[in-house]
Amino acid sequence: MNGIKFSANYENNPAMRRVVNPFYSYLRYKSFIMSYPENLRYTKDHEWISLDGAIATIGITDFAQRELGDIVYVEVETIGKHLEAGAVFGTVEAVKTVSDLFLPVSGTINELNPALANSPELINNDPYGAGWMVKMKVDSSADVDDLLDAAGYEAVTG
């Protein structure tokens, strides 16, 4: 195999090759670490959105929080404001950088996750659960369908 000498057990046992193969291990590691929930939609700017009727919950993806590092502060000053899709609705501050947060769809932001005021690390620990950022009333639920599904977002993040 490619000029590398392997033990007879490895050569003759396909199951063993799958377990030991570094590329296979990387794929298993990546799929375990970087899984994207199928029930959410995603943006190329690394936000996720979950829709329940006309109310959407929005946060940043696992990929985004890993790239940012330890999150120390979230600022959203757009509560009660109507914003268009793509508008900046706040910022997230990590130890190494500050990043804008972009609204995936048009609507009015109703609520900021109150737990983030004292525990912004929830975004790092549970980005798709307790680490949600805002809830909003969307103008059109059809806009959500135009966003990326999990497979599309995974293709963006490589």
Question: What are the residue ranges of the model-derived segments?
Answer:
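Mid-chain, well-packed structural core segment of small domains
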Residues: 92-130
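Acidic, low-complexity mobile loops and tails
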Residues: 32-91, 121, 125-158
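Short, intrinsically disordered low-complexity segments
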Residues: 16-17, 27, 40, 65, ...
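Contiguous hydrophobic segments
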Residues: 13, 116, 155-158
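Intrinsic disorder/low-complexity signal
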Residues: 2, 9-10, 23, 37, ...
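Short, low-complexity, charge-dense intrinsically disordered segments
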Residues: 1-31
